[in-house]
A protein has these predicted regions:
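Extended recognition/assembly regions associated with phosphoester-bond processing machinery
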Residues: 1-202
Length: 202
C-alpha cells in the first residue's frame, strides 16, 4: 500500500529533455509501484531504500520528457492512479512559485485554525488557474522552490525524551555528550514519520 506519493523533484533540463524524479513510499515488502508514462517520455527502473525507523520502502523513478514547442501536460499512471505534471515548451521560461515555513512551529497554533493548509490550497488553485493574483493568471506552475523551514520539527524537543534530557544538560556536558545509537534511531524514525505526515496531506 502506498504511504506517500507521488512527490516530484525537478532534476534539470538538458538537450531539451525535462527530468523529473518521482518519489513514492510503500509498505515494506510490497513490490515496486507500477509507473506508466506516455511515449516519448521514458522512465528508468526505480532505486529503492528502506525508510529509517519505519516499516516502509522509498522508491525513486527518474522520468525524461522531451520538450515540445508548446507547454505540454504529461498524464501518467502510478499504481493505477492517474496524475499529471506540466512541462514548459522549448526555450520558454518555466513558471515558478516560492514557499517557506511549511507547517507550524507550535502544533497548538494549528488547532485553532479551520483551514491549516489554506495557503497550500490557494497555491493549488493558482496552479490550476482557478485563482489569480491581481487579475493575472500564473498556472500551470512548473517548479516549486522551497526556502527555510521546509518542514517545522520543533516538537522533537518534547516528543523525544532522550533529546529533551540532552537539551537540559549544562552546556559543558551537552557539547561532550555522545550521540548515541538510540538517539540516532529515535531521530530517524521521528523525521521519517514527520515527512510522511506532512507530504501526504492533500
Amino acid at each position: 500500500m502506498l504511504q506517500l506519493g507521488p512527490v516530484l523533484q525537478f532534476l534539470g533540463c538538458q538537450n531539451h529533455t525535462w527530468g523529473i524524479g518521482v518519489l513514492v513510499v510503500s509498505d515494506a515488502g510490497d513490490p515496486p509501484p507500477a509507473l506508466q508514462v506516455p511515449a516519448p517520455a521514458q522512465v528508468v527502473a526505480p532505486v529503492q531504500m528502506a525508510v529509517p525507523g519505519l516499516s516502509a520502502t522509498a522508491w525513486r523513478f527518474d522520468v525524461a520528457v522531451p520538450q515540445t514547442a508548446a507547454v505540454q501536460t504529461v498524464n501518467y499512471l502510478l499504481s493505477g492512479q492517474s496524475h499529471s505534471f506540466d512541462v514548459p515548451g522549448i526555450d520558454a521560461m518555466p513558471s515558478m512559485a516560492y514557499v517557506s515555513c511549511n507547517g507550524f512551529s507550535d502544533p497548538r497554533a494549528k488547532k485553532g485554525l479551520q483551514q491549516p493548509n489554506a495557503l497550500w490550497s490557494r497555491l493549488g488553485r493558482l496552479h490550476n488557474r482557478i485563482d489569480r493574483v491581481d487579475s493575472t493568471s500564473f498556472g500551470p506552475l512548473h517548479l516549486l522552490l522551497m526556502g527555510g523551514d521546509q518542514i517545522y520539527s520543533d516538537d522533537m524537543w518534547v516528543k523525544l525524551p532522550e533529546l529533551q534530557a540532552w537539551s537540559e544538560l549544562p552546556w559543558p556536558q551537552r557539547i561532550t555528550a555522545p550521540f548515541t545509537a538510540s538517539l540516532r534511531n529515535a531521530l530517524a524514525a521521528h523525521f521519517s514519520r514527520l515527512y510522511l505526515d506532512r507530504w501526504s496531506q492533500p
